[in-house]
Amino acid sequence: MSAVIKHSEERLMKVLLAPVISEKATFVAEKNEQVVFLVMPDATKLEIKAAVELLFKVQVESVQVANRQGKQKRSGRFNGRRNHTRRAFVCLKPGQEINFTEEAK
């Protein structure tokens, strides 16, 4: 008994904030065929899956989400903290690929 959930296209366009291009994200992409995105703090796995499929025209197999706490930083005598972030590790189905380095056409 699976229910089809409709997400508004406007909401889906706002869910993905940016792709994560780092050494760890590149390693994960090569080894596990996953892509890493920064997402909105209140985004659900189903919204992330729908947003990736809508924006990049690929099929998503699964989504894992990690909440990352912001680091404590100090400037002089003032303490501060960087923002908390939420990352989505999106596993694509075999044969699917998202390439951020090629030019948009």
From Swiss-Prot:
The keyword Chloroplast does not apply. GO terms for biological process: translation. One of its GO terms (cellular component) is ribonucleoprotein complex. GO terms for molecular function: rRNA binding; structural constituent of ribosome. Keywords: Ribonucleoprotein, Ribosomal protein, RNA-binding, rRNA-binding. InterPro entries: Nucleotide-bd_a/b_plait_sf (IPR012677), Ribosomal_uL23-like (IPR013025), Ribosomal_uL23/eL15/eS24_sf (IPR012678). One of the early assembly proteins it binds 23S rRNA. One of the proteins that surrounds the polypeptide exit tunnel on the outside of the ribosome. Forms the main docking site for trigger factor binding to the ribosome. NCBIfam families: PRK05738.1-3, PRK05738.2-4. Belongs to the universal ribosomal protein uL23 family. Part of the 50S ribosomal subunit. Contacts protein L29, and trigger factor when it is bound to the ribosome. This is Large ribosomal subunit protein uL23. It comes from Herminiimonas arsenicoxydans.
